[in-house]
């Protein structure tokens, strides 16, 4: 559960991420594909090379979804319901991959905002991404 301080940290972080969410999403995907090559199996039709238009487009989807989630911290299940259905029923993504992408997102945000990525912000963003992952995998059962 996100505390009021966690929510404030997430809102502040996404305020700084601002218009870079799509770029950070793409960068995090690239990090994930390089660091965890088995994740590439979900994207056999993608050009996974650095800077690929397909990775950038999917990074935008990731960034947009996280921005929407950050705007709806008190009702993540409703905000992410369609995305949860998609990942559970159509794409059938292994839930462990959300944890891997979350890690890569944290690394990406830390790399771009080292002065703002305090231990408290790190913990709050980690909790937020864990909550998002939990919602996205909630319909697998």
Swiss-Prot record:
PTM annotation (N6-succinyllysine): residues: 7, 11, 16, 40
Modification Phosphothreonine occurs at: 108, 134, 137
Residues found modified as Phosphoserine: 3, 49, 102, 124, 138
GO-annotated cellular components: blood microparticle; haptoglobin-hemoglobin complex; hemoglobin complex
Biological processes per GO annotation: hydrogen peroxide catabolic process
Superkingdom assignment: Eukaryota
Family statement: Belongs to the globin family.
Name of this chain's protein: Hemoglobin subunit alpha
Native source species: Lama vicugna (Vicugna)
Primary gene name: HBA
